[in-house]
Regions:
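C-terminal/peripheral segments of proteins
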Residues: 2-260
Length: 260
């Protein structure tokens, strides 16, 4: 966010809309030179295929990007290869270190202690872990691709669930990008929902949207009519009421409270 703001001048409403829906993956940017150390000569045809998809990826988690899926699956498996032998063996419910910690450590130390698998007699290196993790995920990616889900939005499967998690009353498989560690932090079922931008002009103006609707009746067209607009990064102009608006025709009813 700071990088984006530093590059902006005379920021407009459209600039802020673009910022709130920004899908650039800065974690992937910092990790790319690490993953590109993979020895391509040791890859099978299928492994090379997914490596090339990743290498040509533009580092954006846009809905149609396949490289974002390869990166997410590969990075998760690489983390497992590096951390699980030591941490899981402790027998304690310890969390793995932060992803940024791993990226920083691998940049600073190519012989990072945790690269070695303590359960094998050999001493594994970064190259070994990169190869092993990519080989391990290739079959998974082949299945994902065969099911037509290699594009990021289809793989991520963002959904807006009913409070009772009833699928028929939920909206599933939304075509939206973003993800963990991205400004648009939309994950499978969590992330930024209500988006709002307020311009402190005179008069004050505001824009907003949320993934839902204005009716709780699942049979109403207003039950979920904002969701597609939200997924597409669209906004509504909000009505910022002033004292003289109390008789405006847009007001459908009023509520008066009296002491009992």
């Amino acid at each position: 966010i700071n990088r984006k703001l530093d590059a902006m001048n005379n920021i407009t409403i459209d600039d802020m809309k673009a910022l709130q829906t920004e899908n650039y993956n800065i974690k992937a940017e910092f990790a790319k030179d690490i993953l590109l150390k993979t020895d391509e000569s040791k890859l099978s045809a299928d492994e090379k295929k997914y490596f090339d998809i990743y290498r040509s990826w533009n580092l954006r988690n846009d809905p149609q990007e396949k490289g974002a899926t390869v990166f997410a699956v590969w990075w998760k498996e690489l983390e497992k290869a590096i951390w699980s032998d030591e941490i899981d063996k402790s027998g304690l419910p310890l969390p793995w270190p932060n992803e940024a910690t791993l990226v920083e450590s691998l940049h600073k130390d190519s012989a990072y202690h945790f690269l070695d698998n303590i359960n094998t007699p050999s001493k594994e290196t970064l190259e070994d872990d990169l190869l092993a993790s990519l080989k391990k995920i290739t079959d998974t990616l082949k299945i994902v691709e065969a099911n037509g889900n290699l594009e990021w939005a289809k793989f991520k499967g963002t959904k807006v669930q009913h409070l009772l998690k009833i699928p028929a009353l939920s909206r599933l498989h939304l075509p939206i990008g973003g993800g963990n560690g991205i400004i648009n932090a939309t994950k499978e079922d969590h992330g930024p929902s209500w988006r709002m931008i307020v311009e402190l002009s005179s008069p004050t103006e505001a824009w907003g949207v949320y993934p839902g609707g204005q009716s709780g009746n699942a049979g109403s067209k207003y039950y979920d009519n904002f969701i597609d607009l939200w997924a597409a990064g669209k906004y509504f102009k909000l009505w910022f009421m002033h004292e003289g608006d109390r008789l405006d025709k847009k007001i459908k009813w009023t509520m008066k409270f009296e002491k009992g």
